[in-house]
Amino acid sequence: MKKIAVLTSGGDSPGMNAAVRAVVRTAIYNEIEVYGVYHGYQGLLNDDIHKLELGSVGDTIQRGGTFLYSARCPEFKEQEVRKVAIENLRKRGIEGLVVIGGDGSYRGAQRISEECKEIQTIGIPGTIDNDINGTDFTIGFDTALNTIIGLVDKIRDTASSHARTFIIEAMGRDCGDLALWAGLSVGAETIVVPEVKTDIKEIADKIEQGIKRGKKHSIVLVAEGCMTAQDCQKELSQFINVDNRVSVLGHVQRGGSPTGADRVLASRLGGYAVDLLMQGETAKGVGIKNNKIVATSFDEIFDGKDHKFDYSLYELANKLSI
């Protein structure tokens, strides 16, 4: 293998730059030319592909976001559109493509490997949602978790000062991991996630019990994939009358300098992705399972159920929030 390319796609996550850096430097170490595809799959279509050198990834490991930029590209689902993208890679002699992103990004990579056997593809899980099969953790999850913890800690200060209940909405799409892990970490009184049926009356009863024993404030942490914080507020008001406020944390969860854990994970996965390409592997996603770096076929990732919600952690959070 003499030439590879790397792109970031979908929602950005802290640590993507560290992953790109690892891909670029591992490839150059092995005398492989590296090209950066700017603006994700849209960049593949627009031929926005440029050679990267060692210096191209200098001073990036600590930066959030992605210097390669990212963009949604729904038209990439069309085969005729993909032919243009594939030709833009082939004319440069690029034999391998590393795609950093989520489930949709992986599906684009799989299509390329199916439709052009000359180009190998490897996926790296980059999303704060932690919703990708084939890995215990995705790049960006730990940073987003710590961001949420810091924000909720601050909100709790004002909740305490005014004796209020705060209903806080966290990201995560259809996965409740961010809300669960953050909720346990901040001592939230209630955690609302898509994986567990929500009983609003039970939440109201729990808040009321806390008030009766002298509790002045409460934190309700809601995963966006379950309901909005506003909807939760409306439903709660049917069962309990307490001074409350809504806080939607929003895109601040995607930003910020990556934590040490995300930098290390991104570096390990980026380096391993290049190793797999050199070994002739294709149509696989890399990940970490039981602290071991692994590779799983895209088919298994799409069909698999190995990334399961940790119900034991949810039960622990409930026990500790009495």
UniProtKB/Swiss-Prot annotation:
Task performed by this protein: Catalyzes the phosphorylation of D-fructose 6-phosphate to fructose 1,6-bisphosphate by ATP, the first committing step of glycolysis.
Gene Ontology BP annotations: canonical glycolysis; fructose 1,6-bisphosphate metabolic process; fructose 6-phosphate metabolic process
Keywords tagged on the record: Allosteric enzyme, ATP-binding, Cytoplasm, Glycolysis, Kinase, Magnesium, Metal-binding, Nucleotide-binding, Transferase
EC numbers on record: 2.7.1.11
Pfam families, per the entry: PFK
Xref: InterPro entries: ATP_PFK, ATP_PFK_prok-type, PFKA_ATP_prok, Phosphofructokinase_CS, Phosphofructokinase_dom, PKF_sf
Catalytic activity: beta-D-fructose 6-phosphate + ATP = beta-D-fructose 1,6-bisphosphate + ADP + H(+)
Quaternary organization: Homotetramer.
Binding site for ATP: G11, R72, C73, G102, D103, G104, S105
Family classification: Belongs to the phosphofructokinase type A (PFKA) family. ATP-dependent PFK group I subfamily. Prokaryotic clade 'B1' sub-subfamily.
GO cellular component: 6-phosphofructokinase complex
Chief location: cytoplasm
Binding locations of Mg(2+): D103
Residues annotated to bind ADP: R21, A22, V23, V24, R25, R156, G187, A188, E189, R213, K215, K216, H217
Organism in which the protein naturally occurs: Staphylococcus aureus (strain MRSA252)
Subcellular location: Cytoplasm
Binding, substrate: T127, I128, D129, R164, M171, G172, R173, E224, R245, H251, V252, Q253, R254
One GO MF term: monosaccharide binding
Active site (catalytic residues): D129 (proton acceptor)
Protein name according to UniProt: ATP-dependent 6-phosphofructokinase
